Amino acid sequence: MSKHSNSAGRAPGHVQLISSAVAALLLAGCAGNSAQKAEKAHEAAVYNVQLGVAYMNQGDLERAKDKLDRALQQDPNSADVHSARAQLFARLGNKDKADAEYRAALRFAPNDPRMINNYAVYLCQNGRSEEGVKRFLEAARNPIYPTPEAAYTNAGVCLRAAKRDEEARVDFQRALQLRPNFAEAQFQLANLQFDHGELAPARAGIDGFIGTYNATADLLLLGVRVARAQGDRIAAQRYARKLQLDFPGTDQARALAALGAG
């Protein structure tokens, strides 16, 4: 009797253990399926964001919106999805939705300097320079941001638009300290100097850059303007020839023709 009792006592436990194991396998299977579905949805969202951005670049905003709406359904917690949608709404002129989407992107990726920089660009383009500059500097000081010199240059451009040139000068100089071969920062600094009548430092900056690094169309056209303002026709012609040879058919080459410096 006791033997039967022991056997009866073990059987339920044995069955229970098997049931628990089966349940664990089922749960693991569900978790695996959920993870796979989430990964597939994320990949689909990434693809639709790429398509949406491509359509935006082509000016097809209707198709862009369709792709980005799909991306949002597939991965509503993606900062990249919200950032792309923010750019779309900005293009559509819907500032409220654009701002909300940029904020959503930052909510899902608060420390991502790309998202911070993107929002800063939007803020500056819409006259919110104080907020924009603050965001640019936040991105520039982020240790994982690979191009802080670009953020400092953007901050300077934003400050110039707000007629805060001396603060802009500091940010352009910071950018060049971080990356001396960053042509955009050199152009912006030399252009600021030119606008303030500081012809000698503007010319020195242009010549120093071109003599060490690759020239750009913007720097060469500015070189023409600076040299002409200095009355140095030979230097102006030298810049002009290089612009025509190295960058034919560009907007800068056409602007050169309009200056009558070709």
Task: Label every model-predicted segment.
Residues 26-29:
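C-terminal motif of bacterial Sec signal peptides marking the signal peptidase cleavage site
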